[in-house]
Amino acid sequence: MKWFQTAILCVAIALTGCANTSQQSAQKWLYPPMAVPLQPSVQQEVQIARLSQLLQRPDLSDEVRAKMHYERGSYYDSVGLRDLARLDFNQSLQLNPAQPDIFNLLGVYFTQVGEFDAAYEAFDSTIELAPDNTYAERNRAIALYYGGRIDLALEDMTKHYQEMPTDPFRSLWLYIIEAEQNPEQAKANLQQRYLRDRSEEWGWVLVAIMLRDVSDEDALKAIMDGTRENYRLAERLTETYFYLGKRNQLEGDIASAISLYKLAISFNVYDYVEHRYSFLELAQIYDQLQQDRLAKLKAAKTLEIE
């Protein structure tokens, strides 16, 4: 059923992409399409309370206690309580260090807050413990990208992409990293991959948006029309607004990028990297704007002295 809905969505976007200019202008949104922000479920709250009670028992083995800390940390993470999740994950690792999934999650946390060296170490630990963990490969490449180590990021992401060229998210992140070195060539490469590998998988819609193969208005309308469940709409809009923000940022439209990253955050899809990395994107943009402002002030003072 999920595949069918995605196929319908892709067909809708393909059809709207062929609409004439007057139809497109009539479909512009006065306000950005939204979903109701996700809220913690009763099940999540009950599981956190249950695990907290069980962890108070003194007769638990280290193996069981480590597993419970991991489970409670995962629930904390799913409702946005990341500092509490991180504490639980660290406690779980103290009891059982051989947990690659926890190292991967900690690496994402470190990336989000800009602690890149710690992120690299966490992802390296994940890959050492689980060499086939493809999420850690991608996440390490992304951490290297945000940490400014573009050559290493490109090497990692190229290898990751080549392992599954039909994965649209691998294509997207390869493009984002390539664009740091050669924007025009990166876009041409993405266009080639899009024409060769695209399918009904949802992620290729995001590639089409990145390439402007479909207008933003038509894409958002198709997403709204083709998505019934609020949670699914929140997930898709989180991804859409993040990659729209990244596209606008790469094109130099920083003001729009800031607004779109804020929209990506607003749906509370805490376990999506697009939600997590929107915070990092905003922090890096604000840091750069502050540096630019200070540089202008310094230049102005230099002119006054002269």
Specify the residue positions occupied by each region the protein language model found.
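N-terminal leader/linker segments that initiate helical-solenoid repeat arrays
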Residues: 18-71, 291-306
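Helix-start (N-cap) detector for alpha-helical repeat units in TPR-like alpha-solenoids
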Residues: 62, 66, 100-101, 134-135, ...
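Short coil turns that delineate tetratricopeptide repeat
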Residues: 63, 97, 131, 165, ...
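Canonical tetratricopeptide repeat
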Residues: 71, 104-105, 139, 173, ...
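Residue-level recognition of tetratricopeptide repeat
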Residues: 74, 108, 142, 175-178, ...
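Register position in tetratricopeptide repeats
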Residues: 78, 112-113, 146-147, 179-182, ...
